[in-house]
Amino acid sequence: MRRGPTGWEPPGRLEGERAWGQRKAQSILGWLRLSEPRHGISPTEGIVLLPQPDGTSAPLEIVLLAKVSTGFPGVVQLLEWRELPNDILMVMERPERSQDLKHFIRARGFLPEEVARELFHQVLEAVRHCTSCGVLHRDIKPENILVDLATGQAKLIDFGCGTYLQDTAYIHFAGTRSYSPPEWTHFGWYYGKPATIWSLGILLHQMVCGEHPFRTGKKISWDHQLSLPQRLSQAGALGRTLRAWSHPRKEKESLEKLY
């Protein structure tokens, strides 16, 4: 069983502990209504139905999650789904004691390199797994990463913005605007893997610095020069990667190796 580093448990009350809010269920199960509004999309607009081999149809989010979740620990497991008269119900695993990464970071201010390295590696493995299955998550951010506080296992959740991975450019954006790549901001298109690499760089910055690099009025662009804390080890992999990402036009060269 995986165990987290010393200090894995956050102090005091677990803000953001994953009870799934109104979605809570018993034991290790969590449930989610797909009709709940998200990302400013109305309930009915947010559900894309795909035809299935048996002649029925299924929501895209469920199809994508079914492709990537079975047997892989780094993605939340879809256990069952049901179509109700006015809702679609998803039943997923829910670690008994867990917290999303946003609140996991907030409880500490920032993550020590050892903890950040372990969690970031797990997220990378989950992203690699998804892309190998032909799935693009499109909304990688701390809120969509669940940390099992008992084992230290990170799980990628919420495929509501996901789609199939393609070699051609995407001309419709789905996800969180503050994680969108510069090419979308400047040109209105983006490619799946480079956009994922960009959001992973932002995620890593949040983990080791405790804040979003573009939340202080900085415009999302290639010409981003961000100051990094001196506590980051000069020889460490995270420090090298983040320093390359935080200087103009170097992030592709350094982060594309993640794939």
Which functions belong to the PLM regions below?
Residues 119-120:
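Activation segment signature within eukaryotic-like protein kinase domains
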Residues 100-110:
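AlphaC helix of the protein kinase catalytic domain
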Residues 184-194:
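Conserved end of the kinase activation segment
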Residues 131-148:
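Catalytic-loop of the protein kinase fold
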Residues 77-88:
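Short beta-strand micro-motifs within the conserved protein kinase catalytic domain, predominantly
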Residues 231-245:
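Conserved C-terminal C-lobe helix
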Residues 171-184:
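Conserved activation segment of eukaryotic-like protein kinases, specifically the C-terminal portion
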